Amino acid sequence: MFKSSTVALLAAVVTTPCRAQSTAAPDAPGPIVVTGQRDSLHLDTATDAGSRLRLTARETPASIEVLSQEELQLRGLRTARETFNDVAGAIAGNVPGNPAVVSLRGFSGNTVSILQDGVRVSASTVVQRDTNSWHYDRVEVLKGPASVMFGEGALAGVINKVTRKPVLGERHLDGLVSVGSFDTVFAAGGINLPVSSTLAVRADASYQRSDSLYDVDNNQSFSAGLTGSVIFRPSDALSLLIAVDHFEDRYDATYQGLPLIPGQYARDPSDAVTGAAGLVADKALRRRNYNPQGGFSNADETTLRSRLDWRLGGGWTFALDLTGYTADRAFVLTDSQSFAAPNAAFLNGSFRQSFQDFRHDHQFWNARGVVGNDSHVGGLRNRFSLGVEYNYTDFKTLRQQTTAAALPPIDAFDPRPFPVPAGPGIFGALDVMFNSRLNQTSVFAEDGVNLTDTWLLVGGMRWDHIELDRETVTNATGVADRNRPTYDPVSWRIGTTYDVAPGVALYAQYTTAVSPVSSILLASIANTRFELTSGRAYEVGFKVSDTSGRLSVTGAAYRIEQKDILTRDPANPTLAVQGGRQSSQGVELTAAIVPVKALRLSGGVSYTDANYDELGEGVAGVRVDRAGNRPINVPSTTLNASALYTLDGDVTLGGFLRHASAFYTDTANTIEVAGHTVLDASIAWRFTPQASLTLRGRNLTDAFYGEYSGYPSTNVYIGAPRSAEIALSTHF
């Protein structure tokens, strides 16, 4: 029902003309043409991810990157994963249980928080899906710890997806339709309508289906979104926004990555991955899918939220956010493959597999109130905010898993998937229900004082009181294990920004953060008995732009430290204890330049030196020291660059480059994924002022490369092969 209604709405949006009553809204870009002068790195834009003081990115003593909807379309970033992968210093992968999971500044998974409109529902590895990027006005990225803003988990950074909002007094209609390789079809549309001088509504819909975005066998995918909102502003002092967001996705026979096999059995071995015992990535297995018939991963989530903004006078403001969220998710797939050498039954070799059936029933409620003031104290401008936040989460998850011996083997080169196994007996003791209820109350404050017109000092603090009621029930016996831990972490930061010259700002900050040893909602009973890990970070940097807006450059150097991660007891290697340490240090540089009106160049480069400073791992009952090793899925160097050139005002040529250096899939650093470089290109023709046609090629060199590691270290996600698409975009 949702699919058909979405398609009908999109058809209407894309084909129906609409008379413009005023200039286009900032979040509704028309057909893309390089225009030259602009704030290319959004340094003078206030962000919700960086502060609640309404500081601009230039004023904030931290590294902030913003990708606008226009930039998402220019670069052909269709989904959340593609968007996150384009952030300087980040890589992202589509692990089935953690779609669009991010690695940033030497850390990954739960240490990177992902928000929607400034609200963190749960750990990113629980809630994030590879949603269509059409629905976002912009994506804000705060790099480095942000627990002082958003609580536990935000150690490496925060990604805030800001949805499109209504604009008063404007009427416009936008559409985007594309078709491409692997039978991929995408359609999206949005409409902004003024109801009166004080009331406006906006609705956006998107639909994407593909035989497989990665060109993998039996891996059909579908994703759709429907977002709508209404804004009521009876006066300049008062506004109320009410919004609803709904997203769905489904991936058939979910791709778990390419399993590595011993080199002597490979038909077309590659150097994309090298591993212990001669394991290689065999190109002959590039499209193979070993999931059972009927296997799938899907999510169905709905968010209802409201935002009240009230200017009280005298520089005082009040904001109230209310959010309700509900989601159902399923993960029915084979989660690992173990290679067996050829024998009489399987001349090509075979895989033994384990199978899982995981389900999520997730409810979340949030209320946040913030009082702010922007005035002068002692002759100095002072911006202040004080807030209280309450979250309640009810999370139930059925977790059923087999051993590898419970399933029949499958041919490595000619897999004939078996049906999804049935019957509760196949799971045995690995059939449990996790019930989690989480109450969290937070108090936070920020203050920013201008010591001079060019010198800003910013500080903040947050206290969280977290109550977890965690129960694990073994379904076969009804036996329950329970724990009710509480946590009371305090996070804080202090930073300063100094304008040394017009358009040139230097900054420095020190900040702390906390993060659980694993996702709070999915942690084992044993892991809930551990304290939260603690982190701290130092960062210095600069932000530069010229008065014409043609040149913007930012740079940062940082060090992040995390302590009390899980390690193994030296006296008893079978026992997990806290006491491990992990750190990263690095530099980042982003730049955007418009040397002539028709040409725009932009890019970002990062270098990260990340290590386990203290970590012991249990191997066959023995504690093995992993100190000095690099964390999983952390490349030392990343690079992204783009060039856009407009010919005669109507045709724009684009080139886009992404590079990531080698990374490891295991803490032992025995399996290395080689570095890779991917080149995309586009040509866009604006054939009317309201419409443009774009031809885009992806991975033009048809590079065979690993982009991320999944759950088992011997499975690596292979990037999508060369593909092409053609897209029509309209704006009325």
Question: PLM features: residue spans?
Answer:
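Extracytoplasmic beta-strand/coil segments of soluble accessory domains associated
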Residues: D44, D48-A57, P61-I64, Q69, ...
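Membrane-embedded beta-barrel scaffold of Gram-negative outer-membrane proteins
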Residues: R307-G313, T317-T323, A327-L333, D499, ...
